Amino acid sequence: MVMESGRTSAYGNNTNVDFTQSTDDDPLIDGPLVSQDALESAIKREFQTLSTHWAVGVLSFLHVVYVVVCIVITVFCWISDEHTSECTAALNGIDSKTVVLLGKVALWVVVFIYDRVVQRRHSAVRRKGYLDFYRMTKGIKSLPLLIHSAGNAAILTVIAPSSLLDANVKNLSVYLLLAIICLELLLTIICLLRYTVHVVKFNRKKPHPDVTEEERSYGCSSDAHTETGFRDGSSLEDVVEKQADLIDYLKQHNSVLSRRILTLTGQQIRA
């Protein structure tokens, strides 16, 4: 019994020694602790504005220019025959209908590029933790591309039977084409204005990430919900989507914090 207790004691002592040595050999534990002020200054994130206003401005300008050009070409070169020679010289012999349709295709490409740029900027906002703003503008930021895609389908529907339409009413297809183009402009401008209002409010408010805002509201309110994402009237799909976004954001945020803590610790050890 004495020998067994001695072995047990020796084994326990060896375990303690090994644990102490492994702890002492760890440079992160043996090194100086990171001060709270240094850590907060290092992990503090400055708010970065969502700069999509230039894309909205470019799209709006090009869209207005296209509609004006279409109206001028349609009135002077398509409906009227008085300026046929001038139109032929100005368009280098290209048919006015072809110019309008090629311009529509080019405008759709511009709208598609705009949609990709805005989607990329909003994905960056989502990764930074502004999940409510991302979901609030998720639909409206994609409406211009949807409007122009539907407009293209409507234009094809009018152009294909244009001879039949013009046989019943003179230049009916031209008037319908202009109506579709002008309606596209009206709906697109409305969507862009609403989207711009949301972006301007977001940039002026300069909010913290949603996790930080909910922690503050929970700390100030005694009857706050204890689980992130649950609100009165929220559907299960919205709750699951928000919690999934929060998990992705927190994973990325934790990895960033870990790298910064290691960097600060290494700097203090070298100092």
Swiss-Prot record:
Q: Which family does the UniProt entry place this protein in?
A: Belongs to the TMEM192 family.
**Name listed for the protein in its UniProt record:** Transmembrane protein 192
How does it sit in the bilayer? Multi-pass membrane protein
Q: Which residues cross the membrane?
A: 56-76, 93-113, 145-165, 172-192
Family annotation (InterPro entries):
TMEM192
Assembly, per entry: Homodimer.
- PANTHER family annotated for this entry? TRANSMEMBRANE PROTEIN 192 (PTHR31592:SF1)
Instruction: Specify where the region named Disordered lies, as residue ranges.
Output: 209-234
The principal location of this protein is membrane
The terms describing its cellular component in GO are: late endosome; lysosomal membrane
List keywords of the entry alphabetically: Endosome, Lysosome, Membrane, Transmembrane, Transmembrane helix
Where is the protein found, in the record's own terms?
Lysosome membrane; Late endosome
